[in-house]
C-alpha cells in the first residue's frame, strides 16, 4: 500500500450529501475480488448516459476537462453511506483519488478507506464550503493534504486542521494495511510464539 504523507493535487467536487456506495460503484460491477479495474466504473450511473458506459455525461463534474486528473474529492456530509462494500474505496483509489474531504463519513466506509490507503478527511461544513468555492472559482485549483501535520491547505492558502486516530494515521503514513501491520510486528509475534509450550501447539 502506498504511504500517505503529504499530497498536493487537483481538486474536484461533488456538491451532494448522502452519496452512497451504490452510487460510488453500482452492484453490477462487484464480481471481481481484486482491487484493480474499478475506476472506470466509479459513479457509473452519473458519469455515463448509457448502461454500457460508452457515452459520457458531459454535465457530470468528473467528466469536465478542467477536472481531468483530479486526485482530491470534495463532498458533503455522510459520504459513503449505504452497504458496506469495500469496492467503494477500491473504485475511488483506482480512479486516482488519494483523499476525500467531507464534513462526515459513514463509519464502515471510513474504516474501509483507511484500510485501503485512501485518506478520509473530516472538516466542518463551513470549511468544506470554502474549499468548494475556491475550487469552483479557479480552474486548476489544487489542495494540499498533509498527514504529517494533519492540515489541509486551500487553493488560496487557508489552512484547516483535521484529526485522525493515531492508529489509522500510523497505517497511512507507513502504507500498512491489516496484513502489513501484522507483519510489522513479526519479531514480537515470533518471540511470543517461541515461548508457547509445545504441548499447546
Curated annotation (Swiss-Prot):
Heterodimer of LeuC and LeuD. Its EC number is 4.2.1.33. This is 3-isopropylmalate dehydratase small subunit. Keywords: Amino-acid biosynthesis, Branched-chain amino acid biosynthesis, Leucine biosynthesis, Lyase. The gene is leuD. Gene3D superfamilies: Aconitase, domain 4 (3.20.19.10). GO terms for molecular function: 3-isopropylmalate dehydratase activity. Pathway: Amino-acid biosynthesis; L-leucine biosynthesis; L-leucine from 3-methyl-2-oxobutanoate: step 2/4. One of its GO terms (biological process) is L-leucine biosynthetic process. Catalyzes the isomerization between 2-isopropylmalate and 3-isopropylmalate, via the formation of 2-isopropylmaleate. The keyword Lyase applies. SUPFAM superfamilies: LeuD/IlvD-like. GO terms for cellular component: 3-isopropylmalate dehydratase complex. It catalyses: (2R,3S)-3-isopropylmalate = (2S)-2-isopropylmalate. It holds the Pfam family Aconitase_C. Belongs to the LeuD family. LeuD type 1 subfamily. It is an enzyme of class 4 (lyase).
